[in-house]
């Protein structure tokens, strides 16, 4: 097993273009890019909210226990 050569990749790419067509591949690439961009935006928006909510929480008050008399 030699692995995948450049010639094999070109043949696979040509078959994909023949099966799906260039317009379908172009729209698929745009959709994939938009999905990745939306995912990154959601991750970046979520991180500051998590940090601020952790800072907003106040620790519970410390209670004192006294021995029974």
Swiss-Prot record:
NCBIfam families: PRK01614.1, PRK03625.1, tatAE. It comes from Dickeya chrysanthemi (strain Ech1591) (Dickeya zeae (strain Ech1591)). Belongs to the TatA/E family. TatE subfamily. It is found in: Cell inner membrane. This is Probable Sec-independent protein translocase protein TatE. Residues 45-69 are annotated as: Disordered. Gene3D superfamilies: 1.20.5.3310. PANTHER family: SEC-INDEPENDENT PROTEIN TRANSLOCASE PROTEIN TATA, SEC-INDEPENDENT PROTEIN TRANSLOCASE PROTEIN TATE. InterPro entries: TatA/B/E, TatA/E, TatE. Keywords: Cell inner membrane, Cell membrane, Membrane, Protein transport, Translocation, Transmembrane, Transmembrane helix, Transport. Residues 54-69 have a biased composition (Basic and acidic residues). One of its GO terms (molecular function) is protein transmembrane transporter activity. The chain crosses the membrane at residues 1-21. GO terms for biological process: protein transport by the Tat complex. It is a single-pass membrane protein.
């Amino acid at each position: 097993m030699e692995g995948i050569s450049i010639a094999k990749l070109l043949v696979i790419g040509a078959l994909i273009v023949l099966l799906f067509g260039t317009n379908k591949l172009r729209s698929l690439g745009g959709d994939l890019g938009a999905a990745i961009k939306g995912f990154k935006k959601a991750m970046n928006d979520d991180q500051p909210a998590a940090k601020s909510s952790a800072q907003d929480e106040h620790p519970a008050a410390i209670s004192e226990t006294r021995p029974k008399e």
